[in-house]
């Protein structure tokens, strides 16, 4: 495609924190460009998944191609790529941004700048994108446009003098946003090679078509019938159809350089078209792939087990189907003495885990038990080998372990100055070490290195509660650090329950063991015999509590009489309980497995 035809293409993305009105702004842009008829419009057109709608978040990237007649009379092709806003999905954001030349930074004029938009904005600036600030929700009585502009300049460091002030809800000034896109965002630049290079922004599975990939053609063109090569896997596929979303799917005869659209090739699963990979022609391949591709690594692992063992094949099928759509989801079969057969699943973070579990339960009608999530530790064995460990019950015997290393993350927290003290106290409690504090206008940026294990469980909730909801968090993985870690096992009547094992810092082991025993004591129902709950590190018992037996009053029909008669009856009862304890099994309810999650609450 010549540089003339590329001159009127604008590829842009929207960067925003959760709830700052990104999807609503997208709706208005689609409406103004006539992408959908008025009767077809609905709130958050692009959030197609019901969970995305309910939670008010965007999970998968989506795209729309719209024609726009500008005020100078020219028709421009706007390709808008919608990105997820949550920290778990930051890799998908970086891929969406790599496909654009510019980005709209949407900031809620009432709330100001938040951490997630800062992180994504830095990614955009690093990739050389033109960032256009947009202040949304100016119809709110609490909106303060000047303060929001000052914050953008202080926190992010880009000029916000000519930021566009809009209200996506009422549609005020949306035309100014479109003019800013056309005049301030540059067209795609011609590349040095004429061979096909296309970046995969996202892939999803369609029941009728197989895998549909959202791509940005950097150079060359893709037509139905051409044979393409996926550069990271080395596999070739035949292209069946290509087209764009308007947001409805529309077929075209070809996708040219600078355009964003979908392709449908004979790919069977999403792993055949990984996000961030490069497509090229098999007959005439490009000399090198586009930069920035990386395998998605799960950071949080948990066991998922069906409540009813007969649902195991259905769970496998449901996970297989979900994995077609979700390249970051990993799973492998696992069996647990306490829970039966299930799967060990890997997720990007806690939100990702919740969404997967919710989709399994809702879309596939499964009733699931999940074990406590753990992060991936590195174990250095005495023979010098290093193994990753995502399941505490699989920890090798301690005499074979040289050291255990935990993942450390760098957390950037943005907060109003009033809550700095509370947040520092929270980070110190979580074994954090402070990197720095910067005062930026009306916000404070606090940087900490924290153990990931402390962050994945409930750090986000606690951060919101100590800052009354004002603080926001962004984090990324740094490295593995060695430390004195031990595994705390839970024994019920002397039997180890593998699903309740946790790995903790040695200094916390006693306290966590005690808390776990107390919590379990409240959750395990009383039996006809005493149930001993113990927490152990290795062979050493560190805590114990007992669920007392239910007992019948065997002395009820003894009036006065001989004490030896009473003794005999009590001894007989005791003997019976003892025999019962030898054969009795304790059923552990689902709540008990979640007790590990709610330990600090």
Curated annotation (Swiss-Prot):
It is a peripheral membrane protein. SUPFAM superfamilies: EF-G C-terminal domain-like, P-loop containing nucleoside triphosphate hydrolases. Keywords: Cell inner membrane, Cell membrane, GTP-binding, Hydrolase, Membrane, Nucleotide-binding, Protein biosynthesis. It is found in: Cell inner membrane. GO terms for biological process: positive regulation of translation. GTP binds at residues 19-24, 136-139. It is an enzyme of class 3 (hydrolase). Gene3D superfamilies: 3.30.70.240, Elongation factor 4, C-terminal domain, Elongation Factor G (Translational Gtpase), domain 3, P-loop containing nucleotide triphosphate hydrolases, Translation factors. Pfam families: EFG_C (PF00679), GTP_EFTU (PF00009), GTP_EFTU_D2 (PF03144), LepA_C (PF06421). PROSITE patterns: G_TR_1, G_TR_2. Its main location: membrane. InterPro entries: EF-4, EFG_III/V, EFG_V-like, EFTu-like_2, G_TR_CS, LepA_C_sf, LepA_CTD, LepA_IV. It comes from the Bacteria. It catalyses: GTP + H2O = GDP + phosphate + H(+). Its EC number is 3.6.5.n1. Residues 7-189 form the tr-type G domain. GO terms for molecular function: GTP binding; GTPase activity; guanosine tetraphosphate binding; ribosome binding; translation elongation factor activity. GO terms for cellular component: plasma membrane. Belongs to the TRAFAC class translation factor GTPase superfamily. Classic translation factor GTPase family. LepA subfamily. Required for accurate and efficient protein synthesis under certain stress conditions. May act as a fidelity factor of the translation reaction, by catalyzing a one-codon backward translocation of tRNAs on improperly translocated ribosomes. Back-translocation proceeds from a post-translocation (POST) complex to a pre-translocation (PRE) complex, thus giving elongation factor G a second chance to translocate the tRNAs correctly. Binds to ribosomes in a GTP-dependent manner. This is Elongation factor 4. It comes from Xanthomonas oryzae pv. oryzae (strain KACC10331 / KXO85). The gene is lepA.
């Amino acid at each position: 495609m010549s540089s003339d035809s590329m001159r009127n293409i604008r590829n842009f993305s929207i960067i925003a924190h959760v709830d700052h009105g990104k999807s609503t702004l997208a709706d208005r842009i689609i409406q103004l460009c006539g992408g959908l008829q008025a009767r077809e419009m609905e709130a958050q057109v692009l959030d197609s998944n019901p969970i995305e709608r309910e939670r008010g978040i965007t999970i998968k990237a989506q795209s729309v191609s719209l024609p726009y007649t500008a005020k100078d009379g020219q028709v421009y092709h706007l390709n808008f790529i919608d990105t997820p806003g949550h920290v778990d999905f930051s890799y998908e954001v970086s891929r969406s941004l790599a496909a654009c030349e510019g980005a709209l930074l949407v900031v809620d004029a009432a709330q100001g700048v938040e951490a997630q938009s800062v992180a994504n904005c830095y990614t955009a600036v690093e990739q050389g994108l033109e960032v256009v600030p947009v202040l949304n929700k100016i119809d709110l009585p609490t909106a303060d446009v000047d303060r929001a502009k000052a914050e953008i300049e202080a926190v992010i460091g880009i000029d916000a003098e000519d930021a566009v002030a809009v209200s996506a809800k009422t549609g005020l000034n949306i035309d100014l946003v479109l003019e800013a896109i056309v005049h301030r965002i540059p067209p795609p630049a011609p590349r040095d090679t004429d061979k096909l290079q296309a970046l995969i922004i996202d892939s999803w599975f369609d029941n009728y078509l197989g895998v549909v990939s959202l791509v940005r053609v950097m150079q060359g063109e893709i037509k139905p019938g051409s044979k393409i090569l996926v550069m990271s896997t080395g596999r070739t596929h035949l292209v069946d159809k290509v087209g764009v979303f308007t947001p409805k799917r529309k077929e075209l005869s070809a996708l040219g350089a600078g355009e964003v659209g979908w392709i449908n090739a004979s790919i069977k699963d999403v792993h055949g078209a990984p996000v961030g990979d490069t497509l090229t022609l098999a007959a005439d391949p490009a000399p090198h792939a586009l930069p920035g591709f990386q395998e998605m690594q799960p950071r949080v692992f948990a066991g998922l087990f069906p409540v009813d063992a007969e649902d195991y094949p259905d769970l496998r099928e449901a996970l297989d189907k979900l994995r077609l759509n979700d390249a970051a989801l990993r799973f492998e079969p696992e069996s647990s003495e306490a829970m039966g057969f299930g799967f060990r699943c890997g997720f990007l973070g806690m939100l990702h885990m919740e969404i997967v579990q919710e989709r399994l339960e809702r879309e596939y009608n499964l009733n699931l038990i999940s074990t406590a999530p753990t992060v991936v530790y590195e174990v250095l064995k005495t023979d010098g080998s290093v193994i990753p460990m995502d399941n505490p019950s699989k920890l090798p015997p301690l005499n074979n372990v040289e050291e255990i290393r935990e993942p450390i993350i760098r957390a950037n927290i943005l907060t109003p100055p009033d809550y700095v003290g509370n947040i520092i106290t929270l980070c110190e409690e979580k074994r954090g070490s402070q990197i720095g504090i910067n005062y930026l206008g009306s916000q404070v940026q606090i940087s900490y290195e924290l153990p990931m294990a402390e962050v994945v469980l409930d750090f986000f909730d606690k951060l919101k509660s100590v800052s009354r909801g004002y603080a926001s968090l962004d984090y990324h993985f740094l490295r593995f650090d060695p430390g004195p870690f031990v595994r705390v096992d839970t024994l019920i009547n002397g039997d180890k329950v593998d699903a309740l094992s946790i790995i903790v810092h040695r200094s916390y082991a006693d306290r966590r063991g005690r808390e776990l025993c107390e919590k379990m004591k409240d959750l395990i129902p009383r039996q006809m015999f005493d149930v001993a709950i113990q927490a152990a590190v290795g062979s050493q018992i560190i805590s114990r509590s007992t669920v007392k037996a239910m007992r019948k009053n065997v002395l009820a029909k003894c009036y006065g009489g001989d004490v030896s008669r009473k003794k005999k009856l009590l001894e007989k009862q005791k003997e019976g309980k003892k025999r019962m304890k030898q054969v009795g099994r304790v059923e552990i309810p689902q709540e008990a497995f979640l007790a590990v999650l709610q330990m600090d609450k």
